[in-house]
């Protein structure tokens, strides 16, 4: 309206010269009236602006007051879609505002064991909520003030390896075939997923490493974790055997939930034979609880909630006692055997463990490898340590061939001849 008046009261120079004194006075009064109206509009707008600023400040103070810690912790039970009631209200009748609301409402269960229906969700967008979410609510109004991180068992959080392992495939001797199989099953699906999609195949979900003790199964898993940027969760089989019913299964479930949140993720289960033994009829409650823990593991491996971004590496010394359901395809698809090292592999392992030692040039690793028949990787490392200790005992500056020979004799003396590691 003010623009239209400006157009009406604008005069050209020639037109102004031809106007009489009365016309000019009338035009000036119109302009003065327009200026007065614009000033009144400006004052009214400024007052409205101040009022809105005051309301915003007041609401921010209320939010700040309501968001004071501590919160009451609650769980989202259900999210409902509300539509206003269509019943016609009579004139002058009281109107239930809650029944006229439109949008999402929430059923909430608090830590005080109360179940609350919230027609107004609170300060959190209801579209971002889902059943099972942990939220912080006001202890008086129960309005949702903030979302909280997912709750996991503290024992599961401790399983996450924060520091990246420093091992490399170069630290493993004589297991080139096993390294290739593990890389194909675990590393490539994470680093070159498009190659599998191009071929139209699904990579293995899990890998079972089995063989005698000391042959490098755990070392291989750590080297695999170091080659990927994936989160690494390390579980031990005996860790999952708990006293209370359902506790072990909850640990497995929480471990896979944490892995899904931090995906891509590698879960390494060492000594899986502690929970994965063949099922049998037993009246002992402890045996049944171990079997329930294994059933939860089977469900997580290929159940409805399985995730291809989670890879499982399991290691055991006794693959022969594992349950067939755990070994079938679709769960632990690839089985990689770790045998005792060959003569060539033993020489390579001795070189790896002695590469940082000050070794004399006359040390013949091929001869040492021939002298260490039936030694595993851990025992070959012990030979190198014993050789270094013998050199230290005689105040030598370097380790010679005789020290290694004496180290072999000492490690051999500690071996139990009747011990059968792997049946």
From Swiss-Prot:
Covalent cross-link (Glycyl lysine isopeptide (Lys-Gly) (interchain with G-Cter in ubiquitin)), residues: 234, 278, 415
Positions carrying Phosphoserine: 18
GO CC terms of this entry: cytosol; extracellular region; nucleus; proteasome complex; protein-containing complex
Gene Ontology molecular function: any one: ATP hydrolysis activity
Subcellular location: Cytoplasm; Nucleus
A Pfam family this chain is assigned to: Prot_ATP_ID_OB_C
Membrane spanning residue stretches: none
First-listed, main subcellular location of the protein, grouped into a coarse class: cytoplasm
PANTHER family: 26S PROTEASOME REGULATORY SUBUNIT
Protein name: 26S proteasome regulatory subunit 6A homolog B
Organism lineage: Eukaryota, Viridiplantae, Streptophyta, Embryophyta, Tracheophyta
């Amino acid at each position: 309206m003010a623009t239209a008046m400006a157009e009406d009261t604008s005069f050209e120079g020639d037109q102004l010269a031809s106007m009489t004194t009365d016309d000019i006075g009338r035009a000036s009064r119109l302009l003065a009236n327009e200026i007065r109206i614009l000033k009144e509009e400006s004052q009214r707008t400024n007052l409205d602006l101040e009022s809105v600023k005051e309301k915003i400040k007041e609401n921010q103070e209320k939010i700040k007051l309501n968001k004071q810690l501590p919160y009451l912790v609650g769980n989202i039970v259900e999210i409902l879609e509300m539509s206003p009631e269509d019943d016609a209200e009579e004139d002058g009748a009281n109107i239930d505002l809650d029944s006229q609301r439109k949008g999402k409402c929430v059923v909430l269960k608090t830590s005080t064991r109360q179940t609350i229906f919230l027609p107004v969700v609170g300060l959190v967008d209801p579209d971002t909520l889902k059943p099972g979410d942990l939220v912080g609510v006001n202890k008086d109004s129960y309005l949702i003030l903030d979302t909280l991180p997912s709750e996991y068992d503290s024992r599961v959080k401790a399983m996450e390896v924060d520091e990246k392992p420093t091992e490399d495939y170069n630290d493993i001797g004589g297991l080139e075939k096993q390294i290739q199989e593990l890389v194909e099953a675990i590393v490539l699906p994470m680093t070159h997923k498009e190659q599998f999609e191009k071929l139209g195949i699904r990579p293995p979900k899990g890998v079972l490493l089995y063989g005698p003790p000391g042959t490098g199964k755990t070392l291989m898993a750590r080297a695999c974790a170091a080659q990927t940027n994936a989160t690494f969760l390390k579980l031990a089989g005996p860790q999952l055997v708990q006293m209370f019913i359902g506790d072990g299964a909850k640990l497995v479930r929480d471990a896979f939930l944490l892995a899904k949140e931090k995906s891509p993720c590698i879960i390494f289960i060492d000594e899986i034979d502690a929970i994965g033994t063949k099922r049998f009829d037993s009246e002992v409650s402890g045996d049944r609880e171990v079997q329930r823990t294994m059933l939860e593991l089977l469900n997580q491996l290929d159940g409805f909630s399985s995730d291809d971004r989670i890879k499982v590496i399991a290691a055991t010394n006794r693959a022969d006692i594992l349950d067939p359901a755990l070994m079938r395809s679709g769960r632990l698809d690839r089985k990689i055997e770790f045998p005792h090292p060959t003569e060539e592999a033993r020489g390579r392992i001795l070189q790896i463990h002695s590469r940082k030692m000050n070794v004399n040039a006359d040390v013949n690793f091929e001869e040492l490898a021939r002298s260490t028949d039936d030694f595993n990787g851990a025992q070959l490392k012990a030979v190198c340590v014993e050789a270094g200790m013998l050199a230290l005992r005689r105040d030598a500056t370097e380790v010679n061939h005789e020290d290694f020979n004496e180290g072999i004799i000492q490690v051999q003396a500690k071996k139990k001849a009747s011990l059968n590691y792997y049946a």
